[in-house]
C-alpha cells in the first residue's frame, strides 16, 4: 500500500511543480531571483518552496500574510521608487532607474501575489 501512495504523492508534487513553472508568476519568480535583474532574494526571504532557502534579512520576509492589503498599485509604486514611501530605504528604485521595465515589475507583482 505504501508504494502506490508514494507514487501518488510524487505525481502530485510533479504536477504542482509543472503548474508553477507554467504560471504567470513563474517569470516574476525568475526576475525576483536573478542577480542581473531584480535580485530581490538578496534582501528578502520567501516561504519555503517559493524560492531558495536563504536567510536574507535586510528587507522584510515576503509572504501572503505580510503582503495582505498590498494591491497592485501599491506594490507597483513601491517597486518603481520605494524612496517615495520611505526616504531612508536601501531598496533600489527599480522603475525609476530602469532596472526593471514595466512588464517585469508586473510579473514580480504576479509572483508576490502568488506567495503562500
Give short role names for the model-derived ranges.
Residues 38, 60, 89:
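Glycine-centered loop/turn positions within well-structured domains
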Residues 32-33, 42-80, 93-96:
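Gly/Gly-Pro-rich "capping" loops immediately C-terminal to redox-active cysteine motifs
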Residues 37, 83-84:
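Generic structural signal for secondary-structure transition and capping sites
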Residues 8-17:
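Bacterial N-terminal signal peptides
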Residues 28, 37-47, 108, 112:
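The canonical Cys-X-X-Cys-His
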Residues 1-9:
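Bacterial N-terminal signal peptides that target proteins for export
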Residues 73-78, 84-86, 96-116:
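C-terminal capping alpha-helices of c-type cytochrome domains
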Amino acid at each position: 500500500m505504501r508504494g502506490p501512495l508514494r507514487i501518488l504523492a510524487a505525481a502530485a508534487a510533479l504536477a504542482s511543480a509543472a503548474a508553477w513553472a507554467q504560471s504567470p508568476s513563474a517569470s516574476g519568480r525568475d526576475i525576483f531571483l536573478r542577480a542581473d535583474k531584480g535580485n530581490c532574494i538578496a534582501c528578502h526571504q520567501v516561504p519555503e518552496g517559493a524560492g531558495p532557502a536563504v536567510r536574507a534579512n535586510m528587507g522584510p520576509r515576503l509572504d501572503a500574510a505580510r503582503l495582505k492589503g498590498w494591491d497592485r498599485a501599491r506594490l507597483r509604486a513601491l517597486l518603481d521608487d520605494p524612496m517615495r514611501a520611505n526616504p531612508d530605504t536601501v531598496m533600489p528604485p527599480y522603475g525609476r532607474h530602469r532596472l526593471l521595465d514595466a512588464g517585469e515589475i508586473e510579473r514580480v507583482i504576479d509572483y508576490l501575489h502568488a506567495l503562500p
